[in-house]
């Protein structure tokens, strides 16, 4: 695992699970939290996201929400977690929370018209090699006319992912249901990611079709190195088993 200096920029994914009775409040707070986050020192980019059930693009899961954030430094994220009303509210109201800190190593594309990782220095997976764990982020704005084809392809790929060796955890999220979607997946290694991306005929075929038919008006693809995690996701902390003893 790479140890990150307090002044180094980083990204984070926070998953929040609420009790069913807390869902209406979570919905109502989205707008207020967005305004507060927009004024947070050191926060370069953020998106508050709903999530789908299971690992793929299933029905909406109203009890689980996600926040993807990009920070000027680890110190800025530390200060947010220690002093922000938003972070305090998450801790007080969520029945489960998991935060993963990451450093992007390769990416291309845009999210909402901007590069969320502008200012980061790309690296060849930071020299850790193909055996180190990796996070994959995909994000796309789907053209409405391709919605039916996308849903059919997503259902087929979800079946493949369920059997994919090396996939530790994954989820689908979105800003706008069906049309503005993202996926996050945690893999045992970069080698496992490449095995899925390049050896899987069904996945490769879908990727080629999206480009040929122009499914997306905007897309982003990124690989990130997981650095540390806190809390639990569905009752477990999935990153710790992938890191060398004593480094997490």
Q: Residue spans of the language-model regions?
A:
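Active-site/pore-lining binding-face segments in mid-to-C-terminal subdomains
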Residues: 187-204, 211
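A short beta-strand motif that forms the metal-chelation/ATP-contact edge
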Residues: 182-186
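Extracellular/lumenal glycan-associated surfaces
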Residues: 70-73, 188
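A common structural junction motif
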Residues: 85-94, 203-205
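Residue-level detection of the helix-turn-helix DNA-binding "recognition helix"
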Residues: 82, 208
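Flexible helix-coil linker/hinge segments at domain or subdomain boundaries
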Residues: 214-218
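Short S/T/G/P-rich N-terminal loop/turn motif that feeds into the first structured element of a domain
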Residues: 1-57, 61-62, 74-80, 93-180, ...
């Amino acid at each position: 695992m790479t140890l990150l200096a307090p002044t180094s920029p980083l990204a984070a994914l926070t998953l929040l699970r609420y009790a069913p009775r807390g869902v209406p409040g979570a919905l109502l707070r989205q707008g207020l939290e967005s305004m507060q986050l927009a004024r947070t020192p050191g926060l370069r980019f953020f998106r508050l996201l709903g999530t789908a059930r299971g690992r793929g693009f299933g029905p909406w899961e109203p009890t689980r929400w996600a926040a993807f954030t990009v920070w000027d430094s680890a110190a800025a994220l530390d200060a947010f977690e220690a002093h922000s009303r938003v972070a305090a509210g998450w801790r007080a109201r969520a029945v489960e929370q998991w935060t993963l800190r990451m450093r992007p190593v390769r990416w291309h594309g845009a999210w909402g018209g901007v590069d969320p990782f502008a200012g980061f220095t790309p690296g060849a997976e930071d020299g850790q090699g193909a055996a180190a764990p990796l996070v994959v982020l995909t994000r796309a704005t789907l053209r409405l006319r391709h919605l039916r084809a996308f849903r059919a392809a997503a259902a087929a790929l979800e079946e493949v992912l369920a059997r994919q060796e090396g996939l530790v955890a994954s989820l689908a999220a979105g800003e706008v249901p069906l049309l503005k979607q993202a996926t996050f997946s945690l893999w045992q290694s970069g080698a496992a990611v490449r095995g899925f991306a390049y050896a899987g005929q069904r996945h490769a075929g879908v990727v080629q079709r999206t480009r040929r038919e122009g499914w997306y008006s905007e897309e982003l693809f990124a690989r990130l190195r997981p650095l540390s995690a806190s809390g639990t996701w569905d009752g477990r902390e999935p990153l710790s088993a992938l890191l060398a003893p004593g480094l997490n």
